[in-house]
Amino acid sequence: MNTTISNQTPHIRIFDTTLRDGEQSPGCSMTPQQKLVMARALDELGVDIIETGFPASSHSDREAVAMMGRELRRPTLAVLSRCLQADIETSAKALETAANPRLHVFLSTSPLHREHKLRMSREQVLESVHRHVTLARGYIDDVEFSAEDATRTEEDFLAEVTRVAVAAGATTINLPDTVGFTTPEEIRGMFSRLIASVEGADKVIFSAHCHNDLGLAVANSLAAIEGGARQVECTINGIGERAGNCALEEITMALKVRGAFYNIDSAINTPRIVSTSQLLQRLVGMPVQRNKAVVGGNAFAHESGIHQHGMLRHRGTYEIMRPEDVGWESSQMVLGRHSGRAAVERRLRALGYLLEEEEVKLMFEQFKALCEKQRLVTDADLQALMQDATVQEGYRLASMTISDVGSRANALVELSDPEGNRVAETAQGNGPVDALFGALASATGVKLELDSYQVHSVGIGADARGEASLSVRHDGVEYEGTGTSKDIIEASALAWLDVANRLLRQRERGVIAGKTAAVA
């Protein structure tokens, strides 16, 4: 693809607005110190322009901008300002500490905004653009002008606004899809026509700022690049107003992966992407969904047997980029009900088990049976299956009775031991679960120190079951167990026995000698 490159910039400039537009996402506000921490990460990521805030909106933003200006000397630091003299003066003052400052002024241009928000005519909008861009340029040489709601603005008027802003001294023209309304074909054409027709367009950088209301923010930003845009405004994890903005990690990796098509890349240090994404998640408390492109937990995870088999042959069969290129350590072969025998055998081999063909077949059958009971199978589950294949089954719950004894509870449990004999024991405790665990300890001879215990519902309505999860210690080693039943007390007993039986199996095989292997 060959598109005339405005201003002959050698790469797509990444304008990150996580600290301004991104922070406007409900629940994502940051303190000045948190903004500085995030800005440092954006600097290390290689972002060209960091939009640091909206100084006229709060003292907190002014403080944050000044802090970033004193410390960050490489990237351009931008601040947002309305087309108001007081805003521009406040913004210019906030940028006094910055080595590479940019004033970013904006004004709505669409008929809807002109009539209902601004109550201004076309002529008044043009006059305001000229006056305030000129004012901004008097303070700082690098001035960006944004025509808010550009994609719903009459194109002839948008061309006139652009011409006036360029003539007044704007160095970057941003054409936002403020409400995520446009489509790739429309925005590509808009940029292409304006760059070709507006006087002075070859002297400025054209920029796209796309929102994700229809899920098209990244696609529209790529289309704008095809139309000649050479700056893209985006945020980490795509956070921002309403449905968010163009996601930095997605747009930059699209340019890198499809480099042969776009013939232009960003300067982003892509192996820093995942750590930067995770930092933002911690700072604002907004985790990304697991299937989020590039940075989601499942972005490089493979469960399907067909996919796993292909990945084992050649990773390019089902991955278009390397996880290491964005900061993940490696691809994940997730074991679950869709996994094939080859993936299970490979994982067992990695755990140190070398099996004959018949043993692999038997293990895979047991693996598939386990997958009917739980969504994912961990390494510990595989180890337990291997232990089950070579030693007798452990203790099984035959019956239990819980009763109140004054302020305390009494538990009677009857178990079947590994040889099939019945073992019955009683115990008292401070509540039914405490009594139950005491009786189980007496019956099995296994002493477990309880660290945590949780129960929750699994399923919906009449089919719901209780799942008990517990974390215990034995000889200083931490173990975890789960149990599921219609009765939560029974589920608790099964969770306790889950740990005890695995511990006993490991002991019988000589896997543990007091403190060797943990069961997870």
From Swiss-Prot:
The keyword Cytoplasm applies. Residues 396-520 are annotated as: Regulatory domain. SUPFAM superfamilies: 2-isopropylmalate synthase LeuA, allosteric (dimerisation) domain, Aldolase. Its EC number is 2.3.3.13. Its cofactor is Mn(2+). Pathway: Amino-acid biosynthesis; L-leucine biosynthesis; L-leucine from 3-methyl-2-oxobutanoate: step 1/4. The keyword Metal-binding applies. CDD domains: DRE_TIM_IPMS. It is an enzyme of class 2 (transferase). Belongs to the alpha-IPM synthase/homocitrate synthase family. LeuA type 1 subfamily. PANTHER family: 2-ISOPROPYLMALATE SYNTHASE 1, CHLOROPLASTIC-RELATED, HOMOCITRATE SYNTHASE-RELATED. This is 2-isopropylmalate synthase. It comes from Xanthomonas oryzae pv. oryzae (strain PXO99A). The lineage of its organism: Bacteria, Pseudomonadati, Pseudomonadota, Gammaproteobacteria, Lysobacterales.
